[in-house]
Amino acid sequence: MTTWPYPYWIAHRGAGKLAPENTLAAFRLGAAHGYRMFECDVKLSADGVPFLLHDATLQRTSNGQGTAGDQPWATLSQLDAGSWHSRAWAGEPLPSFEAVARYCLRNGHALNIEIKPTPGAERLTGEVVARHAARLWAGQATPPLLTSFQPDALEGARHSA
């Protein structure tokens, strides 16, 4: 039996409720509290860029409107994903998956990547996220943990990894 290679305590969406979820600010705050593994939600922009967001729509955690997966990354990257939480986080952007992955790799943090596809893009999202993760973690001793509540997303990830 192999041993579990990941920390047992995982900071949900970065720093849970302490900072705006799924932002680099949340990851930095979680690390400051001692967390060494993080969970994040990754979906695709309309032009295929993986980025972090839990909800299907933008309204709850940003100043955007509509379905997140219908927007190009150029639009999504300009949104304020911090003000909904508090004024202290105003201007915090939605991060790309690559930015969060590089932060984790640079700081020795493990990552649980929950694949959160836009409905109808389950398999594609799994494929793209898995390819990005494989490229970013190439040569690393401990790969990221890929999870999803969407079986088609996991199937796509399995075939791409």
Q: Which residues make up each language-model segment?
A:
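Phosphate-group recognition and catalysis centered on beta-loop-alpha active-site segments
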Residues: 1-161
